[in-house]
Amino acid sequence: MVRQVVLDTETTGLETSQDHRIIEIGCVEVVNRRLTGRHYHQYINPERGVDQGAMEVHGITNEYLADKPVFASVADEFLEFIKGAELVIHNAPFDVGFIDHEFGKLDDYSPVATHCGVTDTLVMARQRHPGQKNNLDALCKR
């Protein structure tokens, strides 16, 4: 059995070095290349403001996030969902970097790579379509 979790995040900005945080995690489970119907989705209060540029991309406002749980309160449930799976992520270093940044703020958590394999679909797209746009919108149009 091959268990994969297709994952995406939204964030307050682009840089963990500026303490930007995850504000949304969405995942679907795939077993043997078939959707199982299991998913994980959570909006997260980042305990900081969302940069205007990021808000223009994803449309998630500070007001909407104000009553959402903080990452620490959902970390166990999220880790349980992804543990042991191969994560499939477009531009994986970005998402994994943010997930590791969030786990790094907590006690007794280790990096994602200790729990999961990671496949980066952006790397795959660049190999298959060199010199072309390989963002998700461009790939969906092909």
Language model segments and positions:
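Conserved non-catalytic scaffold segment of RNase H-like nuclease domains
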Residues: 1-116, 129-142
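Histidine/lysine/aspartate-rich catalytic loop segments that bind and position anionic ligands
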Residues: 115-124
